[in-house]
Amino acid sequence: MSCARITVTLPYRSAKTSIQRGITHCPALLRPRFSACTPLASAVPLSSTPLINGDNSPLKNTHQHVEERSSKRREYLLEETARKLQRNDTESVEKLKLIDNIQRLGIGYYFEDAIDAVLRSPFSAEEEEDLFTAALRFRLLRHNGIQVTPEIFLKFKDERGEFDESDTLGLLSLYEASNLGVTGEEILEEAMEFAEPRLRRSLSELAAPLRSEVAQALDVPRHLRMARLEARRFIEQYGKQSDHDGDLLELAILDYNQVQAQHQSELTEITRWWKQLGLVEKLGFGRDRALECFMWTMGILPHPKYSSSRIESAKAAALLYVIDDIFDTYGKMDELILFTDAIRRWDLEAMEGLPEYMKICYMALYNTTNEICYRVLKDTGRIALPYLKSVWIETIEAYMVEVKWFSGGSAPKLEEYIENGASTVGAYMVLVHLFFLIGEGLTHQNVLFFKQKPYHKPFSAAGRIFRLWDDLGTSQEEEERGDMASSIRLFMKEYKLSTVEEARSCVLEEISRLWKDLNEGLISIKDALPLTIVKVALNIARTSQVVYKHEQHTYMLSVDNYVEALFFTPLLSS
């Protein structure tokens, strides 16, 4: 099979969009916004396409025929790939490379048991004689939640305590592995400090494609990348490699397109729900939110089998969007106090004293949350309402704290701002909803992880990273509207910094530190909680970086291209 021809190329650092749109404050979870004037919306108007309206009957027979044909081919390719993983005559390092390619291509979920068996199998010291292999194995083990010590890298240091800087592939592999470190793992900190500057210096001397691979790693290391975007990008890159596995590439393309079709179906359902809810029309403000909400939930929970969980969490996210608009723009102080009190009470009588527009929003939240809880009860037998209600109360109270800060003209302490902001961006709300919707590991002990405050370190780290990336991506626009409390300004104030650039550097350093806390989920709480919910926390941080890592003076960027590639543009092979 020849290499794939991909319609949309996806660099990690997006360029500025040609159309600048007005931005109003909204919870970070639900940015970016898309309007009818954007290039994407013009090409694929959500209000008129058969996909969104559910009127896809003319395409039904064609789709069914294509699905049947591709399904048979996919089954064959799955069997072939499984055989390659199970072969005993393949060198261990080649199996590690195969696993790495499978997971980067976005098809790892088909082979989870086989991958786990390979990674847990004995690996001799002779097979880890080179730095590249040792670092690759370390990264794969930790990425998949398997215990491994970084002490394995000590033997690669010379008498001066340094690694071999002439081994570019080894340094690149080591750098990628070092991004999975946790606090206290000094060997990984030293590895990153050694590898990063040397890789940067070597860029001009490297030949393609290694130069491109090193540049991408220095921009966004693999561990920090959003899974579906990485799959799409790597499918294109992998197809250009002279030694690529044609069957593996074909399987990745077939699967990408199949999952994309599934996402279109999910988006149709979310859009239909949102239109039936009629909240925007009844409130008289806000915009349609289905597309941007779903992009977030897909980034946070990409596995195809969690379709209903994505749909239900996107509904909760859309309501958070509306509530944020109320607190930030439309609500008066006395109304917001009443609304917060009504949320605390959580009963229909509590909304009697609310203005009409708040009653509508309250009823939508009340009914949607109860419907989600009914689904959880039906699917898992667990009662989720006390926990979902609690996280909504926590989130609304956090909004109220921000309103009091801004209305009183007082600046919070940096730590206070970041922790409160982890709630207002919606990180904890999403974590709690998805924990119950996914339904894995719903034991009494595990539920306690979501009752204790502050939240467990990896969950708190995910929310804080989200908050900080939001500030990096939107602080200028928010300051122009008069919202002066952001982590950037608070860093400047508390650390007596003279420039915004210095403060932004401090924010990025804090994000790097928080990733070490987040990585602890892979080696600690995963022994209690299922790895799936740990990966939800990781994906919250990854998706926020995709959305907000752009030129600091622009918020709306070509994320539109990401959305079009993820949901509307299939991969083509030739």
Curated annotation (Swiss-Prot):
Q: Binding residues for Mg(2+) 2, per the UniProt record?
A: D324, D328
**Position of motif DDXXD motif?**
324-328
From the UniProt record, give the pathway where this protein acts. Answer: Secondary metabolite biosynthesis; terpenoid biosynthesis
Tell me the residue numbers annotated for binding Mg(2+) 3.
D470, T474, E478
Give GO terms: molecular function aspect only. Answer: magnesium ion binding; R-linalool synthase activity; terpene synthase activity
Q: Which residues bind Mg(2+) 1?
A: D324, D328
Chain segments carrying region Disordered: 52-71
List the EC numbers from the record: 4.2.3.26
Q: Which cofactor does it need?
A: Mg(2+); Mn(2+)
Q: Where is the transit peptide?
A: 1-40
Q: Where does (2E)-geranyl diphosphate bind?
A: R287, D324, D328, R467, D470
Details of cofactor binding: Binds 3 Mg(2+) or Mn(2+) ions per subunit.
| Keyword Transcription in annotation | no
Record's catalysed reaction(s): (2E)-geranyl diphosphate + H2O = (R)-linalool + diphosphate
Protein's cellular compartments: Plastid, Chloroplast
UniProt KW DNA damage keyword = no
Keywords on this record?
Chloroplast, Lyase, Magnesium, Manganese, Metal-binding, Plastid, Transit peptide
According to its UniProt record, this protein's enzyme class is lyase
**Domains as described in the record:** The Asp-Asp-Xaa-Xaa-Asp/Glu (DDXXD/E) motif is important for the catalytic activity, presumably through binding to Mg(2+).
- Family listed: Belongs to the terpene synthase family. Tpsb subfamily.
Function in brief: Monoterpene synthase that catalyzes the formation of (3R)-linalool from geranyl diphosphate.
Protein name (record): R-linalool synthase, chloroplastic
Per the UniProt record, the source organism is: Ocimum basilicum (Sweet basil)
Upper classification of the organism: Eukaryota, Viridiplantae, Streptophyta, Embryophyta, Tracheophyta
